Protein backbone atom coordinates (compact mmCIF):
# COMPACT_ATOMS: atom_id res chain seq x y z
CA UNK A 1 0.00 0.00 0.00
CA UNK A 2 1.26 3.47 -0.86
CA UNK A 3 1.85 6.12 1.74
CA UNK A 4 0.68 9.67 1.08
CA UNK A 5 3.15 11.45 -1.16
CA UNK A 6 4.60 8.26 -2.68
CA UNK A 7 4.52 7.90 -6.43
CA UNK A 8 2.32 5.21 -7.90
CA UNK A 9 4.24 2.17 -9.11
CA UNK A 10 5.06 2.41 -12.79
CA UNK A 11 5.13 -0.40 -15.27
CA UNK A 12 8.37 -0.78 -17.21
CA UNK A 13 8.62 1.46 -20.25
CA UNK A 14 7.69 -0.18 -23.52
CA UNK A 15 10.80 -0.67 -25.60
CA UNK A 16 12.43 -3.25 -27.80
CA UNK A 17 14.04 -4.93 -24.77
CA UNK A 18 10.50 -6.27 -24.22
CA UNK A 19 10.15 -7.64 -27.76
CA UNK A 20 10.05 -11.26 -26.58
CA UNK A 21 7.17 -10.46 -24.24
CA UNK A 22 5.32 -8.65 -27.04
CA UNK A 23 5.76 -11.61 -29.40
CA UNK A 24 4.51 -14.03 -26.73
CA UNK A 25 1.42 -11.90 -26.11
CA UNK A 26 0.70 -11.59 -29.84
CA UNK A 27 0.86 -15.33 -30.45
CA UNK A 28 -2.76 -16.51 -30.32
CA UNK A 29 -4.71 -19.31 -31.99
CA UNK A 30 -4.61 -18.52 -35.71
CA UNK A 31 -1.54 -16.26 -35.52
CA UNK A 32 1.94 -17.67 -35.01
CA UNK A 33 4.57 -14.99 -34.40
CA UNK A 34 8.34 -15.26 -34.49
CA UNK A 35 11.06 -12.66 -34.10
CA UNK A 36 14.52 -12.18 -35.56
CA UNK A 37 17.10 -9.62 -34.50
CA UNK A 38 20.04 -8.55 -36.67
CA UNK A 39 22.93 -6.41 -35.57
CA UNK A 40 23.97 -5.72 -32.01
CA UNK A 41 21.13 -4.63 -29.75
CA UNK A 42 22.09 -1.45 -27.95
CA UNK A 43 20.50 1.37 -26.00
CA UNK A 44 18.52 3.63 -28.30
CA UNK A 45 17.15 7.14 -27.86
CA UNK A 46 13.90 6.84 -25.91
CA UNK A 47 11.71 8.06 -28.78
CA UNK A 48 13.22 5.60 -31.27
CA UNK A 49 13.00 2.67 -28.85
CA UNK A 50 9.39 3.43 -27.91
CA UNK A 51 8.35 4.05 -31.54
CA UNK A 52 9.95 0.81 -32.69
CA UNK A 53 8.08 -1.13 -30.02
CA UNK A 54 4.74 0.57 -30.72
CA UNK A 55 5.03 0.05 -34.47
CA UNK A 56 5.67 -3.67 -33.99
CA UNK A 57 2.79 -3.80 -31.49
CA UNK A 58 0.35 -2.11 -33.89
CA UNK A 59 1.46 -4.18 -36.88
CA UNK A 60 0.89 -7.39 -34.88
CA UNK A 61 -2.51 -6.12 -33.74
CA UNK A 62 -3.42 -5.46 -37.38
CA UNK A 63 -2.23 -8.93 -38.40
CA UNK A 64 -4.37 -10.50 -35.68
CA UNK A 65 -7.43 -8.50 -36.76
CA UNK A 66 -7.11 -8.65 -40.53
CA UNK A 67 -4.81 -11.45 -41.73
CA UNK A 68 -6.91 -14.48 -40.87
CA UNK A 69 -4.92 -17.61 -40.05
CA UNK A 70 -1.33 -16.53 -40.55
CA UNK A 71 2.27 -16.46 -39.49
CA UNK A 72 3.87 -13.11 -38.70
CA UNK A 73 7.60 -12.50 -38.68
CA UNK A 74 9.07 -9.56 -36.77
CA UNK A 75 12.53 -8.42 -37.87
CA UNK A 76 14.46 -5.84 -35.87
CA UNK A 77 17.70 -4.63 -37.45
CA UNK A 78 20.13 -2.46 -35.51
CA UNK A 79 22.16 -0.50 -38.07
CA UNK A 80 24.90 1.99 -37.32
CA UNK A 81 22.71 4.95 -38.21
CA UNK A 82 19.20 3.57 -38.01
CA UNK A 83 16.84 1.03 -36.55
CA UNK A 84 14.59 -0.92 -38.90
CA UNK A 85 11.54 -2.80 -37.69
CA UNK A 86 9.60 -4.94 -40.13
CA UNK A 87 6.53 -7.11 -39.62
CA UNK A 88 5.46 -9.44 -42.43
CA UNK A 89 2.41 -11.66 -42.35
CA UNK A 90 1.42 -14.34 -44.83
CA UNK A 91 -2.29 -13.99 -44.24
CA UNK A 92 -5.07 -13.07 -46.61
CA UNK A 93 -4.09 -10.90 -49.53
CA UNK A 94 -5.21 -7.27 -49.48
CA UNK A 95 -8.17 -7.94 -51.77
CA UNK A 96 -9.51 -10.57 -49.36
CA UNK A 97 -8.98 -8.53 -46.22
CA UNK A 98 -11.92 -6.80 -44.62
CA UNK A 99 -12.03 -3.05 -45.04
CA UNK A 100 -9.89 -1.27 -42.45
CA UNK A 101 -11.65 -0.44 -39.23
CA UNK A 102 -12.13 3.14 -38.18
CA UNK A 103 -8.91 2.84 -36.15
CA UNK A 104 -5.82 4.92 -36.64
CA UNK A 105 -3.20 2.15 -36.73
CA UNK A 106 -1.26 2.90 -39.90
CA UNK A 107 -1.86 6.65 -39.63
CA UNK A 108 -0.49 6.55 -36.08
CA UNK A 109 2.57 4.63 -37.26
CA UNK A 110 3.15 7.24 -39.98
CA UNK A 111 2.96 10.05 -37.43
CA UNK A 112 5.45 8.34 -35.09
CA UNK A 113 7.90 7.67 -37.91
CA UNK A 114 7.54 11.17 -39.40
CA UNK A 115 8.14 12.81 -36.02
CA UNK A 116 11.49 11.01 -35.85
CA UNK A 117 12.50 11.79 -39.45
CA UNK A 118 12.11 8.18 -40.60
CA UNK A 119 10.36 6.30 -43.38
CA UNK A 120 7.38 3.92 -43.31
CA UNK A 121 6.03 1.42 -45.81
CA UNK A 122 2.74 -0.34 -45.08
CA UNK A 123 1.15 -2.37 -47.84
CA UNK A 124 0.61 -5.69 -49.55
CA UNK A 125 3.48 -8.10 -50.13
CA UNK A 126 4.01 -9.70 -53.54
CA UNK A 127 2.35 -13.10 -53.41
CA UNK A 128 0.05 -12.23 -50.52
CA UNK A 129 0.19 -11.01 -47.00
CA UNK A 130 1.05 -7.59 -45.65
CA UNK A 131 4.26 -5.76 -44.67
CA UNK A 132 4.95 -2.91 -42.29
CA UNK A 133 8.51 -1.60 -42.44
CA UNK A 134 9.80 1.42 -40.55
CA UNK A 135 13.29 2.87 -40.71
CA UNK A 136 14.09 5.19 -37.82
CA UNK A 137 17.31 7.24 -37.63
CA UNK A 138 19.09 6.90 -34.30
CA UNK A 139 21.48 9.84 -34.65
CA UNK A 140 20.20 13.37 -34.52
CA UNK A 141 16.73 12.34 -33.43
CA UNK A 142 14.45 15.33 -33.01
Q: Which positions does each model-derived feature cover?
A:
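Glycine-rich ATP/GTP-binding catalytic cores of kinases/NTPases
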Residues: 1-142
Amino acid sequence: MRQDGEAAPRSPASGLARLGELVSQATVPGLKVRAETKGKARPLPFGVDAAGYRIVQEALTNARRHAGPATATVRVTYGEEDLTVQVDDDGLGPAARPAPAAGNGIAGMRERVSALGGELFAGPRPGGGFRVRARLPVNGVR
